[in-house]
């Protein structure tokens, strides 16, 4: 396999070094962290390739389809669900060498970047020109443009700027059979279905994204932040709903339950539930929005506390150390689970999830963010310690079984922005319903050999005859 790839791609692109294979056997999914710490390697690629051009990606996929070799795309490995793990061995296509900014269009407010571009680098380069992506996931300093598209990501400022599906204007993709596809480069079109949306969230199962054109925005001239205390979860959720209902567009609206508020505010004695609220843009408009938003919060029993806690959160918003440090301990247990629902169901879903998950962790923290006129996401963080890493791995499985059962019973989206990966595979067929068969037909048409991230999204794998020299015991 390696010699075939080297003949196809030339020197310096293909690796079968043990350290490279090991590095591409784990992402930052907590279960994968526990595997690593126990010396387990359920998934291992046979080779890693680092293409430098769309032509090289095309050659790899055409060859893999012809030879029936599994291919798994890899951005920067920051997935928390197992999405980039090579569950059937084969070739990992690491996109990190394709990291150029191809164009910045200041007239039409667009940037075109290759899929391996690190998010925070792109944001800084745009900031130097006076622009922002408006897309700011917690993983901005460790995730790639292609990874955002593959997982259907959302940033912390999505309530103003939109999620990744709202920000992508066009993309280039190589199908599993090696064809290059470029979606129309227009602000909008009515020429049939919007094909780019088919690939946003596909987690590499329908091909590999090689570059993306995104919207950009002028840096705001003015920003206001506030921390608001509410007595009850119901009060803060009601304020969020009304803020969105009347048409305000805060860039930041995060509401924490009492358990997470103590962490978010940084005060173990904090009583109540905290909201971080932020508006930005043209000064006059931002000030008007701020006044209305605070008035709404007060009408729902909220008490403004000043901007300090919200400002401190802005400074540390990419910090993932609480979860990472706990997972690094033998027996340390940490997990994040995000779902979404309509306003009339979100509180029942929240209470049911908190109750179902309480037996499995010392702390179950909850917050609401990524807010829409119709509903909101709900993000849960579980923290605890058990006897050892094997027990932690088993406990994580129980946590997901409990969380997904509750989400499905309540009709919630089983993921808002982390994606499916490996961890949600047992639940996706039920979540998609009759749409699963349609997606399977699309997969069969684009990937007749079944080689592109096989098994992900619960799609037919077409594993008969797939070549793989390695790969560990299957987890899926």
Placement of each model-derived feature along the sequence:
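N-terminal flexible segment immediately upstream of the FAD-binding catalytic core
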Residues: 1-62, 79-109, 258-267, 309-335, ...
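Alpha-helix capping/hinge segments and adjacent helical runs
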Residues: 10-14, 408-419, 433, 444-454
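Conserved, mostly hydrophobic/aromatic
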Residues: 64, 204, 447
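Activity-critical C-terminal alpha-helical subdomain
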Residues: 179, 424-476
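FAD-binding subdomain of flavoenzyme oxidoreductases
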Residues: 100-254, 469-476
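C-terminal substrate-recognition/cap domain of FAD-linked oxidoreductases
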Residues: 15-34, 218, 224, 229, ...
């Amino acid at each position: 396999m390696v010699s075939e790839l080297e003949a196809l791609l030339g020197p310096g692109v293909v690796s079968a070094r043990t350290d490279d294979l090991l590095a591409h056997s784990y992402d930052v999914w907590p279960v994968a962290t526990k595997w690593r710490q126990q010396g387990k390697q359920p998934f291992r690629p046979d080779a890693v390739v680092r293409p430098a051009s769309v032509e090289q990606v095309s050659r790899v996929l055409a060859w893999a389809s012809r030879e029936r070799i599994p291919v798994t795309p890899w951005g920067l490995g920051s997935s928390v669900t197992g999405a980039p793990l090579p569950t059937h061995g084969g070739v990992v296509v690491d996109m990190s060498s394709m990291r150029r900014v191809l164009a910045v269009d200041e007239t039409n407010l667009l940037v075109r970047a290759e899929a391996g571009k690190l998010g925070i680098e792109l944001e800084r380069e745009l900031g130097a020109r006076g622009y922002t992506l408006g897309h700011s996931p917690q993983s901005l300093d460790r995730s790639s443009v292609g990874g955002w598209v593959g997982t259907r990501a959302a940033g912390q400022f999505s309530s103003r700027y939109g999620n990744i599906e709202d920000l992508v204007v066009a993309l280039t993709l190589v199908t599993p059979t090696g064809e290059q596809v470029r979606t129309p480069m227009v602000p909008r079109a009515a020429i049939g279905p919007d094909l780019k949306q088919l690939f946003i969230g596909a987690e590499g199962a329908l091909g590999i994204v090689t570059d993306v054109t995104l919207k950009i925005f002028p840096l705001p001239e003015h920003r206001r932040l506030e921390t608001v205390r509410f007595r009850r979860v119901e009060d803060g959720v009601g304020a969020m709903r009304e803020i969105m209902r009347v048409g305000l567009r805060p860039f930041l609206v995060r509401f924490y339950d009492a358990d997470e508020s103590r962490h978010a505010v940084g005060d173990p004695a904090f009583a109540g539930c905290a909201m971080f609220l932020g508006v930005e843009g043209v000064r006059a408009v931002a000030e008007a929005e701020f006044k209305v938003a605070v008035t709404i919060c007060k009408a729902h029993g909220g008490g403004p506390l000043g901007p300090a806690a919200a400002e401190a959160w802005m400074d540390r918003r990419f910090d993932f150390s609480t979860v990472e440090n706990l997972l690094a301990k033998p027996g340390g247990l940490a997990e994040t689970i995000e779902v979404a629902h309509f306003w009339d169901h979100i509180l029942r879903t929240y209470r049911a999830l908190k109750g179902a998950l309480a037996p499995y962790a010392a702390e179950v923290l909850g917050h609401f963010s990524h807010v829409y006129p119709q509903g909101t996401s709900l993000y849960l963080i579980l923290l605890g310690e058990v006897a050892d890493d094997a027990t932690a791995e088993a406990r994580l499985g129980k946590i997901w079984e409990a969380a997904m059962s509750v989400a499905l019973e309540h009709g919630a989206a089983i993921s808002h922005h982390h994606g499916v990966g490996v961890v949600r595979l047992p639940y996706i067929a039920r979540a998609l319903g009759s749409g699963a068969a349609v997606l399977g037909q699309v997969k069969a048409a684009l990937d007749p050999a079944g080689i592109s991230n096989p098994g992900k999204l619960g799609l037919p794998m077409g594993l008969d005859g797939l070549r793989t020299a390695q790969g560990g015991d299957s987890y899926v």
